[in-house]
């Protein structure tokens, strides 16, 4: 494909406009056309664009309309940025856009972004992978209008008892809790729900699987929130990392262990 015929998909980050990457900000500054996910992307990011840039809010557009705008702009030699929330690779619906654009000989460059998952864990001040507690993170969502593969039902994933990050599920919090408990998590398992991670109106609700649903409802949280489940949120015990153990030797550091 012609490298001049491309669309740049940019991860806008979780909300705080300062959390976009330098490369992503530069792409916005240089773009002639920007199509952004208006219901999710912080509009303060649009302050970086050129004064004469064409701005489209994709919240009220369908896929065909989005592709049409991008194709026409590329054909006119314009630099096009598709601005997605968080990191485009997580529930970003980018595969279909890449495939549709390829039909017109248009390539795609992807600039990664900071996921809301990592903004949430930063606010919670937690480590998702604690030695001897959990070394696995499952990123998933409950079944809604988009069906889940049979092997990826929440109750089946819950059998692993690992750290779980659940997107797009707070509106179905009762169903989520029910499936997690049925899958094997204890009712006492720690849970945190982070609404609008990194935004000015961010809200954190902590609890357990036993009480988190009621707490979330009490706070009126119905969307744009992430559910994090697992013992890493409130570990009774964990082991320190071997990486910085003075008795552990690796290629960059000698052991202080006495023999």
Swiss-Prot record:
Top-level taxon of origin: Archaea
Family label: Belongs to the precorrin methyltransferase family.
A GO MF label: precorrin-4 C11-methyltransferase activity
Disulfide bonds: none
Lineage, broadest ranks: Archaea, Methanobacteriati, Methanobacteriota, Methanomada group, Methanococci
One Pfam family of this chain: TP_methylase
Primary enzyme class: transferase
Metabolic or biological pathway: Cofactor biosynthesis; adenosylcobalamin biosynthesis; cob(II)yrinate a,c-diamide from sirohydrochlorin (anaerobic route): step 4/10
Protein name: Cobalt-precorrin-4 C(11)-methyltransferase
This enzyme's EC code(s): 2.1.1.271
């Amino acid at each position: 494909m012609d490298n001049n015929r491309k669309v740049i998909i940019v991860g806008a980050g979780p909300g705080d406009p300062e959390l976009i990457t330098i490369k992503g900000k530069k792409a916005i500054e240089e773009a002639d056309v920007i199509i952004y996910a208006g219901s999710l992307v912080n509009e303060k990011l649009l302050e970086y664009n050129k004064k004469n840039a064409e701005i489209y809010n994709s919240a009220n557009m369908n896929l065909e309309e989005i592709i049409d705008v991008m194709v026409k702009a590329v054909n006119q030699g314009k630099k096009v940025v598709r601005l997605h929330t968080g990191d485009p690779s997580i529930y970003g619906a980018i595969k279909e856009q890449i495939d549709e654009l390829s039909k017109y000989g248009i390539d795609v460059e992807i600039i990664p972004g900071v996921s809301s998952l990592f903004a949430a864990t930063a606010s919670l001040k937690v480590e998702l992978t604690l030695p001897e507690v959990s070394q696995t993170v499952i990123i998933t969502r409950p079944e809604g209008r988009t069906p889940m593969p049979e092997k990826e039902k929440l109750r089946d994933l819950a059998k692993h008892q690992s750290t779980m990050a659940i997107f797009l599920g707070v509106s179905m919090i009762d169903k989520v809790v029910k499936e997690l408990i049925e899958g094997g998590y204890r009712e006492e398992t720690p849970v945190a729900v982070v609404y609008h991670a990194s935004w000015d109106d961010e809200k954190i609700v902590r609890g357990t699987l036993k009480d988190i649903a009621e707490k979330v409802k009490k706070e009126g949280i119905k969307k744009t929130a992430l559910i994090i489940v697992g013992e890493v949120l409130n570990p009774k015990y964990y082991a320190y990392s071997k990486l910085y153990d003075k008795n552990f030797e690796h290629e960059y550091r000698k052991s202080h262990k006495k023999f």
